[in-house]
Amino acid sequence: MEEFTNEVIDTKQLPRYEEVQLTPLHPKYWKVTLINFSIVFVIIGIALTLLWFNKEEFSDIGLYFAITYFVVLLFSLLINRIAFKKKAYAFRNHDVIYRSGIISTNTMVIPYNRVQHVALHEGFVSRIFGLAKVEIFTAGGSSSDLEIPGIEKKEAENIKQLLMGKIQKQL
């Protein structure tokens, strides 16, 4: 019978995910984000305008609503742009890495042996620009699932095939 050992690992010798060159989201995805963003803010703007014109008590504060609306619009646009620039991904031999976050950076490293299945999604606007989103479902539940948006459709299909191949090798 083999004797049990539990040696200390020198963490300085472990590979560093921080040194991996990550791929940013496709530049066309910023256009998709802007269009989706615009749709939401146009709907909100129409609702506020209708409220302003149909209720007399709001006519006095309409200017404040408009100023607040545009400040929120510009701030949201800035936050979305920063968030877009921070998102990046990489696929390595044994895992996938995805980085996001504005104030604090969130980096997910998911080993392929934790992947249960993979889905490819195309939204209406994304499809117009030839982009897709790869969704990776893991054994850890929904909190550890990963969505990588803004990938060219052909590349997303290749990524899905790669991951499906990795899953098949595990079975």
For every predicted segment, state its role.
Residues 1-113, 117-171:
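N-terminal basic, Ser/Thr-rich segments that initiate or prime the first beta/alpha elements at protein or domain
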